[in-house]
Amino acid sequence: EMTSSLVGSEMCIRDSLQADGNYNWNKQQGQRNFLRLAKERGVNKFLAFLNSPPVYFTQNGLATNTGRGGTLNLKEEHYKNFARFLANVIKGVEKHDGIKFNYLCPFNEPDGHWNWIGPKQEGTPATNREIARAIRLISKEFVNNQIDTQILVNESSDYRCMFDTHMTNWERGYQIQSFFNPDSTATYLGDTPNVPRLMVGHSYWTNTPLNNLHDIRCQLKDTLDKYKVNFWQTETCIMGNDEEIGGGGGYDFTMKTALYVARIIHHDIVYAGARSWQWWRSIGGDYKDGLIREYSDPTFLNGEVKDSKLMWALGNYSRFIRPGAVRKAIIAKDNQGKIIPEGDTDVTGLMCSAYQNTDGKEVFVMINYAAEDKEFTFYQRNGIIKNWKIYRTSDKDGENLLPVGSIKNHEKVVIPARSIITLVTQ
Protein backbone atom coordinates (compact mmCIF):
# COMPACT_ATOMS: atom_id res chain seq x y z
CA GLU A 1 0.00 0.00 0.00
CA MET A 2 1.04 3.57 -0.57
CA THR A 3 1.94 5.40 2.61
CA SER A 4 2.27 9.15 2.80
CA SER A 5 2.73 10.99 6.06
CA LEU A 6 0.11 13.57 6.99
CA VAL A 7 -2.23 12.73 4.10
CA GLY A 8 -5.75 12.19 5.41
CA SER A 9 -7.70 9.02 4.60
CA GLU A 10 -10.02 10.85 2.22
CA MET A 11 -7.01 12.04 0.20
CA CYS A 12 -4.94 8.84 0.23
CA ILE A 13 -5.08 6.49 -2.76
CA ARG A 14 -4.05 2.89 -2.13
CA ASP A 15 -1.54 1.81 -4.74
CA SER A 16 -1.81 -1.57 -6.46
CA LEU A 17 2.00 -1.94 -6.36
CA GLN A 18 3.19 -3.64 -3.18
CA ALA A 19 6.56 -3.50 -1.43
CA ASP A 20 7.54 -6.92 -2.78
CA GLY A 21 7.06 -5.73 -6.36
CA ASN A 22 3.82 -7.65 -6.93
CA TYR A 23 0.49 -6.03 -7.79
CA ASN A 24 -2.76 -6.31 -5.85
CA TRP A 25 -5.54 -5.66 -8.34
CA ASN A 26 -8.14 -5.45 -5.58
CA LYS A 27 -6.93 -1.95 -4.68
CA GLN A 28 -8.68 1.29 -5.75
CA GLN A 29 -12.01 -0.44 -6.31
CA GLY A 30 -13.96 2.80 -5.97
CA GLN A 31 -12.00 4.60 -8.66
CA ARG A 32 -12.08 1.59 -10.94
CA ASN A 33 -15.83 1.20 -10.47
CA PHE A 34 -16.30 4.78 -11.65
CA LEU A 35 -14.20 4.02 -14.73
CA ARG A 36 -16.42 1.06 -15.55
CA LEU A 37 -19.60 3.04 -14.93
CA ALA A 38 -18.34 5.78 -17.25
CA LYS A 39 -17.58 3.26 -19.98
CA GLU A 40 -21.02 1.70 -19.61
CA ARG A 41 -22.52 5.15 -20.18
CA GLY A 42 -20.67 5.77 -23.42
CA VAL A 43 -17.37 7.37 -22.38
CA ASN A 44 -14.79 6.05 -24.83
CA LYS A 45 -11.68 8.10 -24.05
CA PHE A 46 -9.76 7.79 -20.78
CA LEU A 47 -6.81 9.84 -19.51
CA ALA A 48 -4.68 8.78 -16.54
CA PHE A 49 -2.43 11.08 -14.54
CA LEU A 50 -0.49 10.84 -11.30
CA ASN A 51 0.95 13.19 -8.72
CA SER A 52 3.80 10.99 -7.49
CA PRO A 53 5.72 7.85 -8.33
CA PRO A 54 5.06 4.95 -5.92
CA VAL A 55 6.59 5.67 -2.53
CA TYR A 56 9.00 2.75 -2.94
CA PHE A 57 10.72 4.78 -5.66
CA THR A 58 10.66 8.30 -4.18
CA GLN A 59 13.63 10.07 -2.64
CA ASN A 60 11.86 10.90 0.62
CA GLY A 61 9.77 7.73 0.89
CA LEU A 62 6.57 9.77 0.62
CA ALA A 63 4.04 10.57 -2.07
CA THR A 64 4.33 14.26 -1.19
CA ASN A 65 7.20 16.63 -1.77
CA THR A 66 7.70 17.39 1.92
CA GLY A 67 11.20 18.64 2.66
CA ARG A 68 12.19 19.00 -0.99
CA GLY A 69 12.48 21.67 -3.68
CA GLY A 70 11.41 21.80 -7.32
CA THR A 71 13.01 18.60 -8.59
CA LEU A 72 11.52 15.17 -9.23
CA ASN A 73 10.89 13.07 -6.13
CA LEU A 74 12.30 9.92 -7.75
CA LYS A 75 15.51 8.09 -6.94
CA GLU A 76 18.08 7.90 -9.72
CA GLU A 77 18.06 4.11 -9.72
CA HIS A 78 14.27 3.92 -10.07
CA TYR A 79 13.60 5.81 -13.34
CA LYS A 80 13.31 2.52 -15.26
CA ASN A 81 11.21 0.97 -12.49
CA PHE A 82 8.87 3.97 -12.66
CA ALA A 83 8.45 3.49 -16.42
CA ARG A 84 7.85 -0.23 -15.94
CA PHE A 85 5.27 0.48 -13.23
CA LEU A 86 3.29 2.74 -15.57
CA ALA A 87 3.33 0.15 -18.33
CA ASN A 88 2.14 -2.51 -15.89
CA VAL A 89 -0.72 -0.33 -14.64
CA ILE A 90 -1.87 0.51 -18.18
CA LYS A 91 -1.88 -3.19 -19.09
CA GLY A 92 -3.34 -4.30 -15.76
CA VAL A 93 -6.33 -1.96 -15.78
CA GLU A 94 -7.17 -3.01 -19.33
CA LYS A 95 -6.84 -6.69 -18.44
CA HIS A 96 -8.81 -6.59 -15.18
CA ASP A 97 -11.37 -3.85 -15.90
CA GLY A 98 -11.58 -3.62 -19.68
CA ILE A 99 -10.57 0.05 -19.54
CA LYS A 100 -7.99 1.20 -22.07
CA PHE A 101 -6.21 4.40 -21.14
CA ASN A 102 -5.86 6.38 -24.35
CA TYR A 103 -3.63 8.97 -22.70
CA LEU A 104 -1.19 9.14 -19.81
CA CYS A 105 0.22 12.29 -18.26
CA PRO A 106 3.05 11.22 -15.91
CA PHE A 107 3.66 14.71 -14.48
CA ASN A 108 1.05 17.03 -13.02
CA GLU A 109 1.99 20.71 -12.71
CA PRO A 110 5.76 20.12 -12.58
CA ASP A 111 6.34 23.88 -12.74
CA GLY A 112 4.04 24.68 -9.81
CA HIS A 113 5.20 27.72 -7.87
CA TRP A 114 2.77 27.30 -4.98
CA ASN A 115 3.46 25.36 -1.80
CA TRP A 116 4.57 21.85 -2.73
CA ILE A 117 5.37 21.04 0.90
CA GLY A 118 2.98 19.11 3.12
CA PRO A 119 -0.07 16.85 2.85
CA LYS A 120 -2.02 18.73 0.19
CA GLN A 121 0.46 18.28 -2.63
CA GLU A 122 -1.34 17.73 -5.91
CA GLY A 123 1.60 17.97 -8.24
CA THR A 124 4.86 16.49 -9.43
CA PRO A 125 7.70 19.04 -9.24
CA ALA A 126 10.28 18.27 -11.92
CA THR A 127 12.72 19.99 -14.25
CA ASN A 128 12.38 19.71 -18.01
CA ARG A 129 15.44 17.45 -18.15
CA GLU A 130 13.99 15.10 -15.56
CA ILE A 131 10.71 15.00 -17.46
CA ALA A 132 12.43 14.27 -20.78
CA ARG A 133 14.52 11.50 -19.23
CA ALA A 134 11.46 9.81 -17.73
CA ILE A 135 9.28 10.25 -20.84
CA ARG A 136 11.92 8.62 -23.06
CA LEU A 137 12.07 5.61 -20.74
CA ILE A 138 8.27 5.37 -20.52
CA SER A 139 8.08 5.54 -24.31
CA LYS A 140 10.63 2.74 -24.64
CA GLU A 141 8.71 0.61 -22.14
CA PHE A 142 5.44 1.20 -24.00
CA VAL A 143 7.00 0.27 -27.34
CA ASN A 144 8.49 -2.91 -25.87
CA ASN A 145 5.07 -3.87 -24.47
CA GLN A 146 3.15 -2.86 -27.60
CA ILE A 147 1.20 -0.22 -25.68
CA ASP A 148 -0.17 2.53 -27.93
CA THR A 149 -1.27 4.84 -25.08
CA GLN A 150 -0.23 8.41 -25.88
CA ILE A 151 2.14 10.08 -23.39
CA LEU A 152 1.29 13.74 -22.77
CA VAL A 153 3.51 16.61 -21.63
CA ASN A 154 3.25 18.25 -19.38
CA GLU A 155 0.19 19.51 -17.48
CA SER A 156 1.66 22.94 -16.82
CA SER A 157 0.23 24.81 -13.84
CA ASP A 158 0.44 28.16 -15.64
CA TYR A 159 0.40 29.04 -19.35
CA ARG A 160 3.30 31.42 -18.81
CA CYS A 161 5.61 28.52 -17.95
CA MET A 162 4.81 26.93 -21.30
CA PHE A 163 6.36 29.69 -23.41
CA ASP A 164 8.34 31.68 -20.83
CA THR A 165 9.15 31.48 -17.12
CA HIS A 166 6.79 32.46 -14.32
CA MET A 167 7.73 32.33 -10.64
CA THR A 168 10.23 29.57 -11.41
CA ASN A 169 13.59 29.31 -13.18
CA TRP A 170 14.45 28.31 -16.74
CA GLU A 171 14.78 24.63 -15.79
CA ARG A 172 11.00 24.49 -15.32
CA GLY A 173 9.99 27.02 -17.96
CA TYR A 174 10.06 27.45 -21.77
CA GLN A 175 8.41 24.03 -22.00
CA ILE A 176 7.19 24.21 -25.60
CA GLN A 177 10.67 25.17 -26.77
CA SER A 178 12.33 22.58 -24.54
CA PHE A 179 10.27 19.61 -25.70
CA PHE A 180 9.53 20.50 -29.32
CA ASN A 181 12.48 22.53 -30.61
CA PRO A 182 15.05 20.10 -32.13
CA ASP A 183 17.82 22.45 -31.00
CA SER A 184 16.97 21.53 -27.38
CA THR A 185 18.84 18.25 -27.69
CA ALA A 186 18.79 17.41 -23.97
CA THR A 187 15.00 17.60 -23.74
CA TYR A 188 13.59 17.22 -27.28
CA LEU A 189 10.65 14.80 -27.44
CA GLY A 190 9.37 15.55 -30.93
CA ASP A 191 10.53 12.23 -32.39
CA THR A 192 9.77 10.09 -29.32
CA PRO A 193 7.34 7.19 -29.96
CA ASN A 194 3.92 7.53 -28.29
CA VAL A 195 4.48 11.26 -27.66
CA PRO A 196 2.10 13.36 -29.79
CA ARG A 197 3.02 16.87 -30.90
CA LEU A 198 0.79 18.23 -28.20
CA MET A 199 1.18 20.30 -25.05
CA VAL A 200 -1.33 20.22 -22.21
CA GLY A 201 -1.72 22.87 -19.56
CA HIS A 202 -4.01 24.44 -16.96
CA SER A 203 -5.56 27.88 -17.28
CA TYR A 204 -5.39 28.74 -13.59
CA TRP A 205 -4.15 32.20 -12.59
CA THR A 206 -4.36 33.68 -16.13
CA ASN A 207 -8.01 34.73 -16.28
CA THR A 208 -7.70 38.12 -14.64
CA PRO A 209 -7.13 40.99 -15.29
CA LEU A 210 -8.95 40.86 -18.62
CA ASN A 211 -5.91 41.87 -20.67
CA ASN A 212 -4.15 38.75 -19.32
CA LEU A 213 -7.10 36.61 -20.35
CA HIS A 214 -6.45 37.72 -23.92
CA ASP A 215 -2.75 38.49 -24.17
CA ILE A 216 -1.31 35.43 -22.40
CA ARG A 217 -3.33 33.14 -24.66
CA CYS A 218 -2.17 34.98 -27.76
CA GLN A 219 1.45 34.58 -26.66
CA LEU A 220 0.84 30.89 -25.98
CA LYS A 221 -0.73 30.37 -29.41
CA ASP A 222 2.13 32.19 -31.16
CA THR A 223 4.69 29.85 -29.57
CA LEU A 224 2.61 26.74 -30.22
CA ASP A 225 2.24 27.71 -33.88
CA LYS A 226 5.95 28.45 -34.23
CA TYR A 227 6.83 24.88 -33.24
CA LYS A 228 3.73 23.30 -34.85
CA VAL A 229 2.37 21.99 -31.55
CA ASN A 230 -1.30 21.43 -30.67
CA PHE A 231 -2.79 22.34 -27.29
CA TRP A 232 -5.28 20.97 -24.75
CA GLN A 233 -6.56 22.83 -21.69
CA THR A 234 -6.81 19.99 -19.18
CA GLU A 235 -7.70 21.52 -15.82
CA THR A 236 -9.07 24.66 -14.27
CA CYS A 237 -11.48 25.94 -11.65
CA ILE A 238 -12.00 29.20 -9.76
CA MET A 239 -9.02 30.40 -7.73
CA GLY A 240 -8.31 33.13 -5.21
CA ASN A 241 -7.25 35.66 -7.83
CA ASP A 242 -10.58 35.39 -9.70
CA GLU A 243 -11.79 38.36 -7.69
CA GLU A 244 -14.56 39.41 -10.09
CA ILE A 245 -16.69 36.54 -8.76
CA GLY A 246 -15.35 36.54 -5.21
CA GLY A 247 -12.54 34.01 -5.57
CA GLY A 248 -12.84 30.27 -5.14
CA GLY A 249 -14.33 30.09 -1.66
CA GLY A 250 -18.06 29.52 -1.28
CA TYR A 251 -20.13 27.60 -3.82
CA ASP A 252 -22.12 29.57 -6.41
CA PHE A 253 -25.14 28.05 -8.13
CA THR A 254 -25.79 31.10 -10.34
CA MET A 255 -24.85 32.45 -13.75
CA LYS A 256 -22.20 34.67 -12.17
CA THR A 257 -19.68 31.82 -12.05
CA ALA A 258 -21.19 30.12 -15.12
CA LEU A 259 -20.61 33.17 -17.33
CA TYR A 260 -17.13 33.73 -15.92
CA VAL A 261 -16.15 30.16 -16.81
CA ALA A 262 -17.82 30.38 -20.23
CA ARG A 263 -15.64 33.42 -20.94
CA ILE A 264 -12.55 31.36 -20.05
CA ILE A 265 -13.68 28.55 -22.35
CA HIS A 266 -14.19 31.05 -25.16
CA HIS A 267 -10.72 32.54 -24.77
CA ASP A 268 -8.99 29.17 -24.43
CA ILE A 269 -10.60 27.96 -27.65
CA VAL A 270 -10.51 31.15 -29.73
CA TYR A 271 -7.17 32.63 -28.64
CA ALA A 272 -5.12 29.72 -27.27
CA GLY A 273 -6.44 27.28 -29.86
CA ALA A 274 -7.41 24.61 -27.30
CA ARG A 275 -8.61 21.43 -29.02
CA SER A 276 -9.86 19.95 -25.75
CA TRP A 277 -11.17 21.70 -22.65
CA GLN A 278 -11.52 20.06 -19.25
CA TRP A 279 -12.88 21.25 -15.90
CA TRP A 280 -11.75 20.41 -12.38
CA ARG A 281 -14.00 18.80 -11.10
CA SER A 282 -17.40 17.09 -11.41
CA ILE A 283 -18.52 17.15 -7.77
CA GLY A 284 -17.29 19.31 -4.89
CA GLY A 285 -18.09 20.93 -1.58
CA ASP A 286 -18.31 24.59 -0.54
CA TYR A 287 -15.84 25.80 -3.15
CA LYS A 288 -16.22 26.86 -6.79
CA ASP A 289 -14.70 23.72 -8.27
CA GLY A 290 -17.56 21.23 -8.59
CA LEU A 291 -20.11 21.29 -11.39
CA ILE A 292 -22.37 19.68 -8.80
CA ARG A 293 -22.51 20.61 -5.10
CA GLU A 294 -22.38 17.66 -2.74
CA TYR A 295 -23.63 17.53 0.83
CA SER A 296 -22.10 14.43 2.42
CA ASP A 297 -22.89 12.96 5.78
CA PRO A 298 -19.94 12.43 8.17
CA THR A 299 -19.53 8.81 7.08
CA PHE A 300 -19.30 9.66 3.35
CA LEU A 301 -21.82 6.85 2.79
CA ASN A 302 -24.83 9.07 2.07
CA GLY A 303 -25.74 12.61 1.16
CA GLU A 304 -27.35 14.88 -1.40
CA VAL A 305 -26.26 16.63 -4.59
CA LYS A 306 -27.50 19.76 -6.34
CA ASP A 307 -26.73 20.94 -9.87
CA SER A 308 -25.49 24.41 -10.79
CA LYS A 309 -25.82 26.82 -13.69
CA LEU A 310 -22.09 26.23 -14.23
CA MET A 311 -22.80 22.61 -15.14
CA TRP A 312 -25.46 23.61 -17.66
CA ALA A 313 -23.32 26.41 -19.11
CA LEU A 314 -20.51 23.94 -19.78
CA GLY A 315 -23.18 21.88 -21.54
CA ASN A 316 -23.82 24.76 -23.95
CA TYR A 317 -20.43 23.72 -25.35
CA SER A 318 -19.91 20.05 -24.51
CA ARG A 319 -23.43 18.80 -25.27
CA PHE A 320 -23.31 20.07 -28.86
CA ILE A 321 -19.66 20.41 -29.93
CA ARG A 322 -18.66 16.80 -30.46
CA PRO A 323 -15.25 15.10 -30.79
CA GLY A 324 -13.68 15.81 -34.17
CA ALA A 325 -15.47 19.13 -34.66
CA VAL A 326 -13.64 21.96 -36.42
CA ARG A 327 -13.96 25.61 -35.47
CA LYS A 328 -15.19 28.01 -38.13
CA ALA A 329 -14.27 31.66 -38.59
CA ILE A 330 -16.65 34.40 -37.50
CA ILE A 331 -16.80 37.91 -38.94
CA ALA A 332 -18.74 40.52 -36.96
CA LYS A 333 -20.04 43.73 -38.56
CA ASP A 334 -21.60 46.84 -37.09
CA ASN A 335 -24.90 48.37 -38.20
CA GLN A 336 -23.12 50.15 -41.05
CA GLY A 337 -21.63 46.91 -42.35
CA LYS A 338 -18.07 47.66 -41.21
CA ILE A 339 -16.03 44.72 -39.94
CA ILE A 340 -15.35 44.89 -36.19
CA PRO A 341 -11.78 43.77 -35.32
CA GLU A 342 -11.98 40.73 -33.03
CA GLY A 343 -15.71 41.21 -33.22
CA ASP A 344 -16.34 37.71 -31.94
CA THR A 345 -15.11 38.78 -28.49
CA ASP A 346 -16.45 41.56 -26.28
CA VAL A 347 -15.39 40.48 -22.79
CA THR A 348 -18.21 42.43 -21.12
CA GLY A 349 -20.77 41.87 -23.89
CA LEU A 350 -21.18 39.26 -26.61
CA MET A 351 -18.68 36.45 -27.25
CA CYS A 352 -19.31 33.88 -29.97
CA SER A 353 -17.69 30.89 -31.63
CA ALA A 354 -18.83 28.48 -34.36
CA TYR A 355 -18.11 24.81 -35.10
CA GLN A 356 -18.91 22.04 -37.56
CA ASN A 357 -19.28 18.48 -36.28
CA THR A 358 -18.20 15.41 -38.20
CA ASP A 359 -21.86 14.65 -39.01
CA GLY A 360 -22.15 18.00 -40.78
CA LYS A 361 -24.22 19.71 -38.10
CA GLU A 362 -23.14 23.25 -37.28
CA VAL A 363 -23.02 24.74 -33.80
CA PHE A 364 -22.90 28.40 -32.75
CA VAL A 365 -22.33 29.38 -29.10
CA MET A 366 -23.08 32.93 -27.93
CA ILE A 367 -22.36 34.34 -24.47
CA ASN A 368 -24.06 37.54 -23.32
CA TYR A 369 -21.99 38.80 -20.39
CA ALA A 370 -23.82 42.13 -20.28
CA ALA A 371 -26.58 43.14 -17.87
CA GLU A 372 -28.92 43.98 -20.75
CA ASP A 373 -30.45 42.06 -23.66
CA LYS A 374 -28.50 42.05 -26.92
CA GLU A 375 -29.57 41.34 -30.47
CA PHE A 376 -27.75 40.25 -33.60
CA THR A 377 -28.49 39.02 -37.09
CA PHE A 378 -27.00 35.69 -37.96
CA TYR A 379 -26.11 34.56 -41.48
CA GLN A 380 -23.71 32.32 -43.37
CA ARG A 381 -21.51 33.31 -46.27
CA ASN A 382 -22.47 30.30 -48.38
CA GLY A 383 -26.05 31.52 -48.49
CA ILE A 384 -27.57 28.14 -47.68
CA ILE A 385 -30.73 28.73 -45.68
CA LYS A 386 -30.80 26.54 -42.60
CA ASN A 387 -32.99 26.19 -39.57
CA TRP A 388 -31.25 26.62 -36.24
CA LYS A 389 -32.64 25.32 -32.96
CA ILE A 390 -31.84 27.49 -29.93
CA TYR A 391 -30.92 26.19 -26.45
CA ARG A 392 -30.60 28.69 -23.60
CA THR A 393 -29.09 28.69 -20.12
CA SER A 394 -29.84 31.58 -17.76
CA ASP A 395 -30.64 32.28 -14.11
CA LYS A 396 -34.33 31.67 -14.74
CA ASP A 397 -35.68 28.50 -13.17
CA GLY A 398 -35.75 25.70 -15.71
CA GLU A 399 -33.61 27.48 -18.29
CA ASN A 400 -30.94 24.80 -18.35
CA LEU A 401 -30.12 24.17 -22.01
CA LEU A 402 -33.83 24.83 -22.52
CA PRO A 403 -35.06 24.68 -26.16
CA VAL A 404 -36.49 28.16 -26.82
CA GLY A 405 -37.51 28.01 -30.46
CA SER A 406 -35.71 28.17 -33.78
CA ILE A 407 -34.59 30.69 -36.40
CA LYS A 408 -33.42 30.80 -40.00
CA ASN A 409 -30.37 32.51 -41.44
CA HIS A 410 -30.69 36.29 -41.73
CA GLU A 411 -33.22 36.45 -38.89
CA LYS A 412 -32.69 38.64 -35.85
CA VAL A 413 -31.87 36.90 -32.58
CA VAL A 414 -32.36 38.40 -29.12
CA ILE A 415 -30.14 36.95 -26.40
CA PRO A 416 -31.27 37.86 -22.88
CA ALA A 417 -28.96 39.53 -20.40
CA ARG A 418 -26.51 37.28 -18.56
CA SER A 419 -27.30 34.16 -20.57
CA ILE A 420 -25.72 31.68 -22.98
CA ILE A 421 -27.35 30.30 -26.10
CA THR A 422 -26.34 27.51 -28.45
CA LEU A 423 -27.70 27.35 -31.99
CA VAL A 424 -27.64 23.97 -33.72
CA THR A 425 -28.61 23.23 -37.33
CA GLN A 426 -31.64 20.99 -37.65
Mark where each language-model region is.
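An active-site-proximal structural segment forming one wall of the substrate-binding cleft
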Residues: 19-48, 70-106, 131-142, 169-194
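Single conserved hydrophobic/aromatic residue that forms the stacking wall/gate
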Residues: 1-13
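Aromatic/acidic polysaccharide-binding cleft in carbohydrate-active enzymes
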Residues: 230-321, 325-341
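Noncatalytic carbohydrate-binding groove/subsite architecture in carbohydrate-active enzymes
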Residues: 121-264, 271
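C-terminal beta-strand-rich structural cap/linker in extracellular carbohydrate-active enzymes
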Residues: 404-426
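Carbohydrate-binding surface patches
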Residues: 338-386, 418
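Structural recognition of the beta-strand scaffold that forms the well-ordered cores
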Residues: 4-5, 45-50, 102-106, 150-153, ...
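Solvent-exposed beta-hairpin/edge-strand motifs
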Residues: 381-399
